[in-house]
């Protein structure tokens, strides 16, 4: 405790939890979100063919979590759009990423060192949104733990949960990409973070809110930056989830490996044909050499 007092970690966490997100952190959030939109197949073509549809998709990527959370809590779903500064800022980012001459802005923000910084700033915003969602639900439903968890979860990963609707705006329908069925790391982390913040709001978790925000932000930033740098789509929770599902639900261990193996098996089937093919090629080469000698 004396070491903590000397380092003033409590004061640092308090300052960090009250730090304003606008405009620096919010700009980073918008840039990374719309950058991921541009990575989607056909997104660039849609922006040229129908800029309005592309802009709507970008707004869903930036504000989808607020829209979905407001719908759940009975608030007008377009309530957040009264923040003109945020809408203009997100629209400017969308225009620069998709329509900047020579793609200069996109190349700058997609440059890996810059992208890692932006990803780190985005995770700061994600943690703050999860905490705000749980706090908002706590005021409306003091003892509704499940509602707090769901609201925080939606605030942290609402964009991914609305991905199917966003795809419809681009003329794409991929029901197999349902985020609830195949959760990505940010979605899982948002769920676990919402549970932690709910326990803190219920005074079950013996830690201050500012400290929890600081610690969870450090975890999210370090994990997401590491995964982005390595181009990894895995999850740090995979091993724990595998054992928990095996114990509680009887799921087989190593399901993903077996799944990949089964899918890879048909591709490996033609392998035995290669020796015959090599023999045919060798015999053909031999015949050519003999014919040359005969000539």
Curated annotation (Swiss-Prot):
InterPro entries, sorted: TRIC_channel
Name this polypeptide is given: Trimeric intracellular cation channel type A
Disordered: annotated segments: 259-295
Binding-site positions, Ca(2+): 74
Predominant location: membrane
Function: Intracellular monovalent cation channel required for maintenance of rapid intracellular calcium release. Acts as a potassium counter-ion channel that functions in synchronization with calcium release from intracellular stores. Opened by a change of voltage within the sarcoplasmic reticulum lumen.
Biased composition (Basic and acidic residues): 277-286
Binding site for a 1,2-diacyl-sn-glycero-3-phospho-(1D-myo-inositol-4,5-bisphosphate): 122, 126
Keyword Transmembrane: yes
Phylogenetic classification of the source organism: Eukaryota, Metazoa, Chordata, Craniata, Vertebrata
């Amino acid at each position: 405790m004396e070491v903590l007092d000397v380092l003033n970690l409590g004061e640092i966490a308090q300052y960090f939890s009250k730090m304003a997100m606008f405009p620096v952190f919010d700009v980073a959030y918008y840039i990374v979100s719309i950058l991921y939109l541009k990575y989607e197949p056909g997104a660039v073509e849609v922006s040229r063919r129908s800029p309005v549809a592309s802009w709507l998709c970008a707004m869903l990527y930036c504000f989808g979590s607020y829209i979905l959370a407001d719908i759940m809590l009975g608030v007008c779903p377009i309530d957040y759009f009264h923040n003109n500064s945020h809408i203009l800022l997100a629209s400017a980012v969308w225009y620069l990423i998709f329509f900047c001459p020579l793609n200069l802005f996109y190349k700058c923000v997609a440059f890996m060192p810059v992208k890692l910084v932006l990803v780190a700033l985005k995770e700061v915003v994600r943690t703050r949104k999860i905490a705000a969602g749980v706090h908002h639900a706590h005021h409306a439903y003091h003892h509704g733990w499940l509602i707090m968890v769901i609201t925080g979860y939606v605030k942290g990963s609402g964009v991914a949960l609305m991905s199917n609707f966003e795809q419809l705006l681009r003329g794409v329908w991929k029901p197999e990409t349902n985020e609830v069925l195949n959760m990505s790391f940010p979605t899982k982390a948002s769920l676990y973070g919402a549970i932690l913040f709910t326990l803190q709001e219920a005074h079950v978790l013996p830690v201050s809110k500012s400290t929890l925000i600081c610690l969870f932000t450090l975890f999210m930033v370090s994990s997401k930056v590491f995964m982005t740098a390595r181009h990894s789509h895995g999850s740090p929770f995979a091993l724990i989830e595998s054992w928990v599902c095996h114990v509680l639900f009887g799921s087989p261990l190593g399901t993903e490996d077996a799944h990949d193996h089964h899918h890879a098996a048909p591709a490996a089937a033609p392998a035995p044909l290669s020796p015959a093919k090599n023999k045919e090629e060798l015999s053909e080469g031999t015949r050519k050499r003999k014919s040359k000698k005969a000539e």
